[in-house]
Amino acid sequence: MTLDLQTTIEKAWESRANLSPADASAEVREAVEHTIDALDQGRLRVADKSSGEWIVHQWIKKAVLLSFRLQDNEVMGEAPLTFYDKVQTKFADFGAAAFKAGGYRVVPPAVARRGSFIGRNVVLMPSYVNIGAYVDEGTMVDTWATVGSCAQIGKNVHLSGGVGIGGVLEPLQANPTIIEDNCFIGARSEVVEGVVVEENSVLAMGVFLSQSTKIFDRATGTITYGRVPSGSVVVPGSLPSADGSHSLACAVIVKRVDAQTRAKTSINDLLRA
């Protein structure tokens, strides 16, 4: 079934400029709808980890993009929160039974789009989760945090207030941004452009990470890009230019996570009861 979906999506992608709500074939509509529904239920995800490496399923991302070509804008929601969009909100038709079955908490006015997956014991404070995103169990998405399109958030992650996790749809990115299990992302930090923050890492308040951000390891003196090693404690910093005339922002790995760090950033099970 998945192979058939992929074949249909890939073929439709080649002629995407000609797709519209009026003339798309039933086969393409069904393939895209089935893929979005599978993303919504967590049966499919844009990226998953296999043998220690993240594998990105580009065809699923293409299905998400194609879905925007196949839908007209429509009025949704109720006053005073009325919207006009192509993508329905995830909880539009939910009643008490559906929320209990999902096992998560959604604090008004949090919004998750249909096609995003929310795991059990997740808490969505007034925040935003975009289509294609995967938020695994036990994670806290704090107030005004945003989880971008197709971003992958692991188990027991804390996204602090105002955190931005970048999406892939605009500007178009090859790979999703990934925050692995048991990470703590400090307030107002931004992780974008497919950067991977490996498990058990802590980002301090105001850390900005893109593919071009230098990640300086204080212990080794090495500079890397695009990936924070497992168990790192990262703070914002700067590195001087070769001629000493100026400095540019960077992220600094100051140490590895220890018991003291973990005590300061541990999740509160009382909030997930």
UniProtKB/Swiss-Prot annotation:
One of its GO terms (biological process) is lysine biosynthetic process via diaminopimelate. The keyword Ligase does not apply. Disulfide bonds: none annotated. It comes from the Bacteria. It is found in: Cytoplasm. Its main location: cytoplasm. Keywords: Acyltransferase, Amino-acid biosynthesis, Cytoplasm, Diaminopimelate biosynthesis, Lysine biosynthesis, Repeat, Transferase. GO terms for cellular component: cytoplasm. Pathway: Amino-acid biosynthesis; L-lysine biosynthesis via DAP pathway; LL-2,6-diaminopimelate from (S)-tetrahydrodipicolinate (succinylase route): step 1/3. Its EC number is 2.3.1.117. The keyword tRNA processing does not apply. Pfam families: Hexapep_2, THDPS_N_2. InterPro entries: DapD_Trfase_Hexpep_rpt_fam, Hexapep, Hexapep_transf_CS, THP_succinylTrfase_dom1, THP_succinylTrfase_N_sf, Trimer_LpxA-like_sf. It catalyses: (S)-2,3,4,5-tetrahydrodipicolinate + succinyl-CoA + H2O = (S)-2-succinylamino-6-oxoheptanedioate + CoA. Substrate binds at R105, D142. HAMAP family: DapD. Homotrimer. Belongs to the transferase hexapeptide repeat family. This is 2,3,4,5-tetrahydropyridine-2,6-dicarboxylate N-succinyltransferase. The lineage of its organism: Bacteria, Pseudomonadati, Pseudomonadota, Betaproteobacteria, Burkholderiales.
